[in-house]
Protein backbone atom coordinates (compact mmCIF):
# COMPACT_ATOMS: atom_id res chain seq x y z
CA UNK A 1 0.00 0.00 0.00
CA UNK A 2 1.43 3.41 -0.92
CA UNK A 3 1.82 6.24 1.52
CA UNK A 4 -0.84 8.27 -0.31
CA UNK A 5 -3.47 5.61 0.31
CA UNK A 6 -3.04 5.57 4.08
CA UNK A 7 -5.79 7.21 6.07
CA UNK A 8 -5.10 10.21 8.29
CA UNK A 9 -6.33 11.32 11.68
CA UNK A 10 -8.31 14.04 9.91
CA UNK A 11 -10.29 11.34 8.08
CA UNK A 12 -11.71 10.07 11.38
CA UNK A 13 -14.71 11.53 13.21
CA UNK A 14 -13.53 13.84 15.97
CA UNK A 15 -15.56 12.10 18.66
CA UNK A 16 -14.20 8.70 17.60
CA UNK A 17 -10.58 9.86 17.81
CA UNK A 18 -11.19 11.51 21.18
CA UNK A 19 -12.68 8.24 22.45
CA UNK A 20 -9.58 6.35 21.32
CA UNK A 21 -7.35 8.79 23.20
CA UNK A 22 -9.53 8.54 26.31
CA UNK A 23 -8.99 4.77 26.23
CA UNK A 24 -5.21 5.19 25.82
CA UNK A 25 -5.28 3.83 22.27
CA UNK A 26 -4.35 5.25 18.86
CA UNK A 27 -4.90 4.13 15.26
CA UNK A 28 -1.71 2.82 13.65
CA UNK A 29 -2.38 3.61 10.00
CA UNK A 30 -1.97 7.42 10.12
CA UNK A 31 1.58 7.05 11.48
CA UNK A 32 2.53 3.68 10.00
CA UNK A 33 5.08 5.10 7.57
CA UNK A 34 6.70 7.11 10.36
CA UNK A 35 7.61 3.95 12.27
CA UNK A 36 7.97 1.64 9.24
CA UNK A 37 9.22 3.78 6.35
CA UNK A 38 9.89 2.30 2.92
CA UNK A 39 13.41 1.20 2.00
CA UNK A 40 15.49 2.46 4.91
CA UNK A 41 15.01 4.06 8.33
CA UNK A 42 13.79 7.63 8.61
CA UNK A 43 16.92 8.64 10.48
CA UNK A 44 16.82 11.33 13.13
CA UNK A 45 20.52 11.08 13.99
CA UNK A 46 22.49 13.84 12.28
CA UNK A 47 26.17 13.60 11.27
CA UNK A 48 27.20 16.20 13.85
CA UNK A 49 30.81 16.96 14.81
CA UNK A 50 31.85 18.10 18.27
CA UNK A 51 35.14 19.96 18.14
CA UNK A 52 37.28 19.41 21.20
CA UNK A 53 38.62 22.96 20.94
CA UNK A 54 35.04 24.17 21.52
CA UNK A 55 34.03 21.70 24.23
CA UNK A 56 37.24 21.62 26.30
CA UNK A 57 36.98 25.18 27.73
CA UNK A 58 33.41 24.49 28.89
CA UNK A 59 34.52 21.22 30.46
CA UNK A 60 37.36 22.91 32.34
CA UNK A 61 34.98 25.62 33.50
CA UNK A 62 32.67 22.91 34.82
CA UNK A 63 35.60 21.89 36.99
CA UNK A 64 35.62 25.38 38.51
CA UNK A 65 31.85 25.70 38.84
CA UNK A 66 30.91 22.27 40.18
CA UNK A 67 32.92 20.32 42.76
CA UNK A 68 33.08 16.61 42.02
CA UNK A 69 31.12 15.89 45.22
CA UNK A 70 28.12 17.62 43.62
CA UNK A 71 28.49 15.97 40.23
CA UNK A 72 29.54 12.37 40.96
CA UNK A 73 30.97 12.40 37.45
CA UNK A 74 31.77 15.82 35.96
CA UNK A 75 30.59 15.16 32.42
CA UNK A 76 29.48 17.17 29.40
CA UNK A 77 27.21 15.01 27.25
CA UNK A 78 27.45 15.18 23.45
CA UNK A 79 23.82 15.63 22.41
CA UNK A 80 22.68 15.08 18.84
CA UNK A 81 20.17 17.82 17.94
CA UNK A 82 18.31 15.46 15.63
CA UNK A 83 17.43 13.30 18.62
CA UNK A 84 16.63 16.18 21.00
CA UNK A 85 19.28 17.62 23.30
CA UNK A 86 17.29 16.64 26.38
CA UNK A 87 17.56 12.95 25.44
CA UNK A 88 21.37 12.98 25.74
CA UNK A 89 22.00 10.67 22.77
CA UNK A 90 24.73 10.87 20.16
CA UNK A 91 22.96 8.17 18.10
CA UNK A 92 19.79 6.23 18.78
CA UNK A 93 21.56 3.70 21.02
CA UNK A 94 24.87 5.36 21.96
CA UNK A 95 25.63 7.89 24.70
CA UNK A 96 28.90 9.83 24.63
CA UNK A 97 30.13 12.12 27.39
CA UNK A 98 33.43 13.88 28.06
CA UNK A 99 34.44 13.49 31.70
CA UNK A 100 36.89 15.64 33.64
CA UNK A 101 38.79 14.66 36.76
CA UNK A 102 41.22 17.01 38.47
CA UNK A 103 44.35 16.14 40.49
CA UNK A 104 43.53 14.56 43.84
CA UNK A 105 39.89 13.92 42.98
CA UNK A 106 38.17 10.55 43.16
CA UNK A 107 34.86 9.31 41.80
CA UNK A 108 33.22 6.87 44.25
CA UNK A 109 32.88 3.14 43.71
CA UNK A 110 29.69 2.18 41.88
CA UNK A 111 28.20 -0.13 39.29
CA UNK A 112 25.39 0.27 36.78
CA UNK A 113 23.30 -1.67 34.33
CA UNK A 114 24.46 0.07 31.11
CA UNK A 115 27.65 -1.15 29.43
CA UNK A 116 30.38 1.49 29.46
CA UNK A 117 33.93 2.19 28.34
CA UNK A 118 36.39 5.01 28.95
CA UNK A 119 38.70 6.22 26.17
CA UNK A 120 41.38 8.61 27.42
CA UNK A 121 41.70 11.91 25.56
CA UNK A 122 44.32 13.78 27.58
CA UNK A 123 46.26 13.88 30.83
CA UNK A 124 48.46 11.65 32.97
CA UNK A 125 47.95 10.13 36.39
CA UNK A 126 44.35 9.03 36.04
CA UNK A 127 43.29 5.51 36.95
CA UNK A 128 40.21 3.33 37.16
CA UNK A 129 39.72 0.52 39.64
CA UNK A 130 37.73 -2.28 38.03
CA UNK A 131 37.02 -5.62 39.65
CA UNK A 132 39.83 -5.20 42.17
CA UNK A 133 42.50 -4.14 39.67
CA UNK A 134 43.99 -0.66 39.31
CA UNK A 135 44.13 0.27 35.64
CA UNK A 136 46.28 3.25 34.60
CA UNK A 137 44.65 5.66 32.17
CA UNK A 138 47.02 6.98 29.52
CA UNK A 139 46.12 8.82 26.34
CA UNK A 140 44.31 6.54 23.89
CA UNK A 141 43.78 3.71 26.37
CA UNK A 142 40.44 1.90 26.28
CA UNK A 143 39.10 0.86 29.70
CA UNK A 144 36.07 -1.44 29.98
CA UNK A 145 33.53 -1.02 32.79
CA UNK A 146 31.03 -3.76 31.89
CA UNK A 147 27.45 -3.89 33.16
CA UNK A 148 27.21 -4.76 36.83
CA UNK A 149 30.97 -4.51 37.47
CA UNK A 150 32.25 -2.31 40.31
CA UNK A 151 34.49 0.58 39.28
CA UNK A 152 35.82 3.87 40.61
CA UNK A 153 38.14 6.56 39.30
CA UNK A 154 40.95 8.71 40.67
CA UNK A 155 43.72 11.10 39.66
CA UNK A 156 47.23 10.97 41.16
CA UNK A 157 48.95 13.22 38.62
CA UNK A 158 49.08 16.89 37.65
CA UNK A 159 46.74 18.80 35.37
CA UNK A 160 43.33 17.71 34.10
CA UNK A 161 42.54 14.21 32.87
CA UNK A 162 39.74 13.95 30.32
CA UNK A 163 38.23 10.82 28.88
CA UNK A 164 35.38 9.89 26.58
CA UNK A 165 32.58 7.84 28.13
CA UNK A 166 30.68 5.56 25.72
CA UNK A 167 27.58 3.77 27.03
CA UNK A 168 24.54 1.96 25.68
CA UNK A 169 22.50 4.16 28.03
CA UNK A 170 19.80 5.16 25.48
CA UNK A 171 19.05 1.48 24.91
CA UNK A 172 19.03 0.46 28.57
CA UNK A 173 17.05 3.55 29.59
CA UNK A 174 14.58 2.92 26.78
CA UNK A 175 13.72 -0.53 28.13
CA UNK A 176 13.32 0.78 31.72
CA UNK A 177 16.43 -1.11 32.87
CA UNK A 178 18.83 1.73 33.73
CA UNK A 179 20.06 2.09 37.32
CA UNK A 180 23.23 2.34 39.40
CA UNK A 181 24.32 1.24 42.87
CA UNK A 182 26.89 2.88 45.14
CA UNK A 183 29.44 0.66 46.85
CA UNK A 184 32.20 0.66 49.43
CA UNK A 185 35.80 1.47 48.55
CA UNK A 186 37.28 -1.32 46.45
CA UNK A 187 40.01 -3.57 47.79
CA UNK A 188 42.95 -4.04 45.44
CA UNK A 189 43.34 -7.80 45.17
CA UNK A 190 45.17 -8.00 41.84
CA UNK A 191 48.67 -6.84 40.94
CA UNK A 192 48.89 -3.84 38.63
CA UNK A 193 48.89 -4.94 34.99
CA UNK A 194 47.36 -8.34 35.71
CA UNK A 195 44.86 -8.44 32.85
CA UNK A 196 47.16 -6.90 30.23
CA UNK A 197 50.04 -9.22 31.20
CA UNK A 198 47.81 -12.29 30.92
CA UNK A 199 46.83 -11.41 27.36
CA UNK A 200 49.91 -9.57 26.12
CA UNK A 201 50.65 -11.62 23.01
CA UNK A 202 48.16 -12.43 20.28
CA UNK A 203 47.59 -16.15 19.92
CA UNK A 204 48.68 -16.85 23.50
CA UNK A 205 46.39 -17.38 26.51
CA UNK A 206 46.92 -18.43 30.10
CA UNK A 207 46.61 -22.23 29.99
CA UNK A 208 43.81 -22.12 32.56
CA UNK A 209 41.72 -20.09 30.10
CA UNK A 210 41.34 -23.17 27.90
CA UNK A 211 38.91 -24.64 30.42
CA UNK A 212 36.89 -21.50 31.07
CA UNK A 213 35.49 -18.58 29.16
CA UNK A 214 35.49 -15.27 31.00
CA UNK A 215 32.99 -12.62 29.99
CA UNK A 216 35.45 -9.74 30.41
CA UNK A 217 39.01 -11.09 30.83
CA UNK A 218 40.78 -8.00 29.43
CA UNK A 219 39.71 -4.65 30.88
CA UNK A 220 42.43 -2.33 29.55
CA UNK A 221 43.69 -1.99 25.99
CA UNK A 222 46.82 0.25 26.05
CA UNK A 223 46.90 2.63 23.10
CA UNK A 224 50.62 2.21 22.46
CA UNK A 225 50.07 -1.49 21.81
CA UNK A 226 47.02 -0.84 19.63
CA UNK A 227 48.91 1.82 17.67
CA UNK A 228 51.85 -0.49 17.04
CA UNK A 229 49.50 -3.28 15.95
CA UNK A 230 47.84 -0.91 13.47
CA UNK A 231 51.22 0.02 11.99
CA UNK A 232 52.19 -3.63 11.61
CA UNK A 233 48.81 -4.47 10.09
CA UNK A 234 49.09 -1.53 7.67
CA UNK A 235 52.42 -2.89 6.43
CA UNK A 236 50.72 -6.06 5.14
CA UNK A 237 47.40 -4.49 4.06
CA UNK A 238 47.12 -3.67 0.34
CA UNK A 239 46.48 -0.08 -0.70
CA UNK A 240 42.77 0.60 -0.94
CA UNK A 241 41.88 -1.74 1.93
CA UNK A 242 40.90 -0.23 5.27
CA UNK A 243 43.35 -0.66 8.15
CA UNK A 244 40.99 -1.37 11.04
CA UNK A 245 41.40 -3.57 14.13
CA UNK A 246 38.58 -4.66 16.43
CA UNK A 247 38.86 -4.73 20.21
CA UNK A 248 37.76 -8.24 21.25
CA UNK A 249 37.58 -10.68 24.14
CA UNK A 250 40.95 -12.49 23.83
CA UNK A 251 39.48 -15.76 25.11
CA UNK A 252 36.54 -15.96 22.72
CA UNK A 253 37.25 -13.56 19.84
CA UNK A 254 33.85 -11.96 20.43
CA UNK A 255 33.26 -8.23 20.77
CA UNK A 256 34.17 -6.74 24.15
CA UNK A 257 30.69 -5.79 25.31
CA UNK A 258 27.22 -7.20 24.60
CA UNK A 259 25.79 -4.26 22.66
CA UNK A 260 28.67 -1.96 21.67
CA UNK A 261 31.65 -2.62 19.42
CA UNK A 262 35.00 -0.83 19.39
CA UNK A 263 37.71 -0.58 16.77
CA UNK A 264 40.77 1.45 15.82
CA UNK A 265 41.40 2.81 12.32
CA UNK A 266 44.65 3.97 10.75
CA UNK A 267 44.51 6.25 7.72
CA UNK A 268 47.80 6.01 5.89
CA UNK A 269 49.48 9.24 4.70
CA UNK A 270 47.41 10.85 1.95
CA UNK A 271 44.82 8.08 2.06
CA UNK A 272 41.15 8.53 1.18
CA UNK A 273 38.99 5.48 1.82
CA UNK A 274 35.32 4.64 2.01
CA UNK A 275 33.93 2.64 4.93
CA UNK A 276 31.45 -0.15 4.36
CA UNK A 277 27.90 1.18 4.47
CA UNK A 278 26.18 -0.67 7.32
CA UNK A 279 22.95 -0.77 9.24
CA UNK A 280 24.80 0.10 12.48
CA UNK A 281 25.23 3.62 13.84
CA UNK A 282 28.56 4.76 15.20
CA UNK A 283 30.84 7.41 16.62
CA UNK A 284 34.30 8.37 15.37
CA UNK A 285 36.84 9.97 17.71
CA UNK A 286 40.14 11.35 16.42
CA UNK A 287 43.09 10.03 18.43
CA UNK A 288 45.94 11.52 16.38
CA UNK A 289 46.16 13.54 13.20
CA UNK A 290 43.73 15.51 11.06
CA UNK A 291 41.63 15.03 7.98
CA UNK A 292 38.08 15.15 6.71
CA UNK A 293 35.00 12.97 6.60
CA UNK A 294 32.03 12.92 4.25
CA UNK A 295 28.88 11.36 5.73
CA UNK A 296 26.28 11.05 2.98
CA UNK A 297 26.19 14.67 1.74
CA UNK A 298 27.76 16.31 4.81
CA UNK A 299 31.47 17.11 4.94
CA UNK A 300 33.46 17.92 8.09
CA UNK A 301 37.14 18.67 8.59
CA UNK A 302 38.46 17.14 11.80
CA UNK A 303 41.50 17.34 14.02
CA UNK A 304 42.78 15.61 17.13
CA UNK A 305 40.16 14.82 19.83
CA UNK A 306 37.16 15.80 17.69
CA UNK A 307 34.15 13.44 17.82
CA UNK A 308 31.61 12.71 15.07
CA UNK A 309 28.23 10.95 14.98
CA UNK A 310 27.57 8.45 12.18
CA UNK A 311 23.88 7.67 11.48
CA UNK A 312 22.68 4.22 10.45
CA UNK A 313 22.90 3.28 6.76
CA UNK A 314 25.34 6.17 6.12
CA UNK A 315 27.93 6.34 3.36
CA UNK A 316 31.20 7.41 5.02
CA UNK A 317 34.45 8.47 3.32
CA UNK A 318 37.55 9.32 5.38
CA UNK A 319 40.57 11.32 4.22
CA UNK A 320 43.93 11.91 5.89
CA UNK A 321 45.07 15.53 5.55
CA UNK A 322 48.75 14.62 5.94
CA UNK A 323 50.90 13.26 3.15
CA UNK A 324 53.61 12.16 5.58
CA UNK A 325 51.95 10.98 8.82
CA UNK A 326 49.11 8.56 9.59
CA UNK A 327 45.87 9.61 11.25
CA UNK A 328 44.35 7.38 13.93
CA UNK A 329 40.65 7.09 14.81
CA UNK A 330 38.73 5.26 17.52
CA UNK A 331 35.27 3.96 16.59
CA UNK A 332 32.27 3.00 18.71
CA UNK A 333 29.32 1.29 17.04
CA UNK A 334 26.18 -0.65 17.88
CA UNK A 335 26.90 -3.49 15.45
CA UNK A 336 26.89 -6.12 18.27
CA UNK A 337 23.35 -5.03 19.14
CA UNK A 338 22.27 -5.26 15.50
CA UNK A 339 23.81 -8.73 15.19
CA UNK A 340 22.01 -10.00 18.28
CA UNK A 341 18.72 -8.59 17.01
CA UNK A 342 19.22 -10.17 13.59
CA UNK A 343 19.07 -6.83 11.75
CA UNK A 344 22.77 -6.27 10.95
CA UNK A 345 23.37 -5.49 7.28
CA UNK A 346 26.36 -4.54 5.16
CA UNK A 347 25.56 -2.88 1.83
CA UNK A 348 27.61 -2.97 -1.37
Swiss-Prot record:
Protein name according to UniProt: Gentisate 1,2 dioxygenase 2
Keywords: Aromatic hydrocarbons catabolism, Dioxygenase, Iron, Oxidoreductase
Pfam families membership: Cupin_2 (PF07883)
Catalytic activities: 2,5-dihydroxybenzoate + O2 = 3-maleylpyruvate + H(+)
Domain (Cupin type-2): residue spans on this chain: 97-165
pH dependence: Optimum pH is 7.0-8.0.
GO process terms (BP): catabolic process
EC number: 1.13.11.4
InterPro entries in alphabetical order: Cupin_2, GDO-like, RmlC-like_jellyroll, RmlC_Cupin_sf
Organism: Aquipseudomonas alcaligenes
Keyword Oxidoreductase carried by entry: yes
Induction context: Strictly inducible. Induced by 3-hydroxybenzoate and gentisate.
Function: Involved in the degradation of gentisate. Catalyzes the conversion of gentisate (2,5-dihydroxybenzoate) to maleylpyruvate. Can also use other substrates such as 3-bromogentisate, 3-fluorogentisate, 3-isopropylgentisate, 3-methylgentisate and 3-ethylgentisate, but is unable to utilize gentisate that is substituted at the carbon-4 position.
Keyword Lipid biosynthesis set for record: no
Regulation: Partially inhibited by Na(+), Ca(2+) or Mn(2+) at concentrations of 5 mM. Presence of 5 mM of Zn(2+), Hg(2+) or EDTA results in more than 95% inhibition.
Coiled-coil positions: none
Temperature notes for this entry: Optimum temperature is 25 degrees Celsius.
Known partners and oligomeric status: Homotetramer.
Protein family according to the UniProt entry: Belongs to the gentisate 1,2-dioxygenase family.
Amino acid sequence: MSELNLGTVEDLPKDYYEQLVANNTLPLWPSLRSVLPHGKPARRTRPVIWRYADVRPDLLRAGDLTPIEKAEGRVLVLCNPGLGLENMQVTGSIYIGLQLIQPGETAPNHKHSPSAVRFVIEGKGGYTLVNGEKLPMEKGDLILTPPGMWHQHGHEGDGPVVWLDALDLPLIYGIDASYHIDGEEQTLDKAAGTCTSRYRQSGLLPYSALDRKTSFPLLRFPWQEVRESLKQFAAVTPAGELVQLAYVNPETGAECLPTLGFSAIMLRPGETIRLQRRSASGVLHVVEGAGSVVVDDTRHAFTEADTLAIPTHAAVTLSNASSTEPTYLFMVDDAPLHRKLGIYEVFS
